UniProtKB/Swiss-Prot annotation:
Protein name according to UniProt: ATP-dependent RNA helicase RhlB
Organism: Pseudoalteromonas atlantica (strain T6c / ATCC BAA-1087)
Catalytic function, reaction form: ATP + H2O = ADP + phosphate + H(+)
CDD domains: DEADc, SF2_C_DEAD
Record-linked SMART domains: DEXDc, HELICc
UniProt record similarity statement: Belongs to the DEAD box helicase family. RhlB subfamily.
PROSITE patterns: DEAD_ATP_HELICASE, HELICASE_ATP_BIND_1, HELICASE_CTER, Q_MOTIF
EC number: 3.6.4.13
Amino acid sequence: MQTTHLTETHFADLPINEQVVKALSAANFSHCTPIQALSLPPLLEGNDIAGQAQTGTGKTIAFLVATFHYLLSNPQPTKKQPRAIIMAPTRELAVQIFNDAELLSQHTGLSLGLIYGGEGYQSQREKLEEGVDIIIGTTGRIIDYYKQNIFSLAGIQVAVLDEADRMFDLGFIKDIRYLFNRMPKPTERLSMLFSATLSYRVQELAYEHMDNPTHVQVEPERKTGTRIKEELFYPSDEDKMALLLSLMEEEWPDKAIVFANTKHSCEKVADWLQADGHRVGLLSGDVPQNKRLKILEDFTSGKLDILVATDVAARGLHIPMVSHVFNYDLPDDAEDYVHRIGRTGRAGQSGSSISFACERYALNLPAIETYIEHAIPVTEYQADALLRDVTPPKPRHKKRMQNGRNPQKRQSSGSRNRRKP
């Protein structure tokens, strides 16, 4: 974790439980981000919060600090039943929240349970049966265990809903209401809701299940963030891949995400980058959950330098120190452009966004520039200067099942072992 001085407010200057302050200090957190400086004072006084903030603003630490502070300041004699619940729309976001929460739990003695679908059914169940103080997870699996009477929600002191707008988008709102209705009354618990937008339906949810929440809002001056350098190219279809490979060689990003609009396009990009010697991870909707988590772990730790992804990875993922975002395809939804390039330039760091307005997706550009309220600076390129001497990737083999035979597995094209001299 890095120390980022975004406000003059120090965590140590706030009336936060001493154990939590020590945990923050051990993780190199000293100064509050704007959303933390705005939300923590009312939360520390026991007031509910409905906060508007984008991913990457520090909201996770804000609600974790408030949660740990409240539980430590209001101890309960009962054991083995959860005292706080943090609900997230996706498995990846739940894992990231859990990882941040571990930094605080190591110094406070509060136990955590990570609950999400797709894997680990028995191990997660056993963890809940042992007893945890804080449940972090997705609603479907949480409800599954709840209906089996594995745990009770009667002792919940803190409830957190992260990315509430995304919950609506994914159709999880019935699950949210189901869980809220089985907790103590809003007046008997501390509740926090965070969302990228405080739409009417999100505000309605807040007033329905929270106790007169204080509204806090942090919006960047520009939707795309002033620390992100934006750049636009107009490649021909023939030059598009060569331009991407050339820019990778020229920019040599420390950590980059390349977005494409389809699974097929992502596979093509990943194959060419891998053939050129880069260390690449491919993340799309049909990648198995255990493999998705391994790819994200390797990308975060630096074992992979480039992540090629569809928009499934554009929201909710907190991956620190992403230096570059490439829009190989301009997104069909203007809002997705903001979510994509928001993966870089986080927490006071600078970042670069490079977009291709190709023959197929250039028509998406006017809507994007209208939404972000500025034109993206255009850079010209010389077609004859592009990188062309790249060994083409091996063709992908379609999976077949004939006469009981398994499909032949494609061999990896190796790791990215070149570095700038």
